[in-house]
Amino acid sequence: MEVKDILKTVDHTLLATTATWPEIQTILDDAMAYETASACIPASYVKKAAEYVSGKLAICTVIGFPNGYSTTAAKVFECQDAIQNGADEIDMVINLTDVKNGDFDTVEEEIRQIKAKCQDHILKVIVETCQLTKEELIELCGVVTRSGADFIKTSTGFSTAGATFEDVEVMAKYVGEGVKIKAAGGISSLEDAKTFIALGASRLGTSRIIKIVKNEATKTDSY
């Protein structure tokens, strides 16, 4: 797999709580230059970013982030607001307290409501795999499939661990037809990126891949 093909799967991400506009601009510029799938940024920057890229790049943002336990009504509003401001893709965090209470019907209904607001915009559902048992992850693969979401996503990158090969393998086995997989959090090498893609991920959430590509290009130029 060529580097350009990996880059096409990347949601180039900056979600740091202290992210400044110049830093966001760099993310947007790099994402456009390297033709990534999108740039994933905080909701407060979506409107400005959408104006800045002027249709040349998909803008992704997050809702219910990073803990997921805001109310469904709050998440629905966040989704609507983000789309009105120019977001093309929404990454939502599920309420893990519902999962731990075994209330998967509530999780599914919340996703359905948010997908209804998204309409044709892409919705990715973050399940925070590091907090789940294997049985919970398998159940959530069914929940996400039935809800009509476009992607199931491993991680926020703000919890105890990010994506693992094992979790993506489980997702690929149990998620329904038409639902894609996004691996996110801790993807720090091109080899890891290739492995996640080979296991079934069609999107990668990472802030590091472009930096790695730039460093490799610098090494090559210095020879």
UniProtKB/Swiss-Prot annotation:
Gene Ontology biological process terms in this record: 2-deoxyribose 1-phosphate catabolic process; carbohydrate catabolic process; deoxyribonucleotide catabolic process
Predominant location: cytoplasm
Protein localization: Cytoplasm
GO molecular function list: deoxyribose-phosphate aldolase activity
Transmembrane region(s): none
Enzyme's top EC category: lyase
Keyword terms, alphabetized: Cytoplasm, Lyase, Schiff base
Full protein name: Deoxyribose-phosphate aldolase
Pfam families, sorted: DeoC
Species: Streptococcus pyogenes serotype M1
Annotated Gene3D superfamilies: Aldolase class I
The protein's role, per its UniProt record: Catalyzes a reversible aldol reaction between acetaldehyde and D-glyceraldehyde 3-phosphate to generate 2-deoxy-D-ribose 5-phosphate.
Gene that specifies this protein: deoC
Active-site residues, record numbering mapped to chain: D91, K153, K182
